[in-house]
Amino acid sequence: MTHGHVILSHGLHSGPNATKVSALAAVAAESGWSHERPDYSAIDRAGRCGDIDARIALLRERAQAARGPLLLAGSSMGAFVSALVSREVACVGLFLMAPPPVIEGHPQALVAARVPTLIVHGWDDELIPAQAVIDWAQPRRDRLILVDDGHRLAAHVDFCARQFGDFLRSLLAGL
């Protein structure tokens, strides 16, 4: 029996087998959650920011087909589309790594459902200033963990995986 379903969305110029997404998938499986990792690679070839609306459409389709409690998780652009889609589907939580509050050239700023949300972001993120994420998370009172790392959170993959496992357990306690 699975506790729920996790959809893990990779960042731009990444893929479904990327290090962070793979680490989270392993934690989901070990924790009794089914999971999937949509491949946005072909969509992302559309340009600097890829086709964000096509990413959203694919994630929405996958989320609507999911059974049981749904958690959306993502890194960078994957976090952005996960947050946006969370407002359109029934979702029990969000796990966002390095989420951009805005993406230049995209008309929609970051918005998310009012569900339990955990954000991990790097103090030294070279693409998304930590203060921008603090400013976005503060009025929502989301849990925000700032780590001594850059945008890829490369030095904190295991840390992110542990936080994700703890987050899954906390969601289960509330279901």
List the predicted regions and their residue ranges.
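Conserved alpha/beta-hydrolase fold motif
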Residues: 71-72, 94
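Serine-hydrolase catalytic machinery in alpha/beta-hydrolase-like enzymes
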Residues: 2-69, 81-84
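Catalytic histidine neighborhood in serine/cysteine hydrolases
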Residues: 34-36, 138-153
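Conserved alpha/beta-hydrolase "acid-adjacent" motif
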Residues: 17, 126-132
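A conserved short beta-strand
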Residues: 90-102
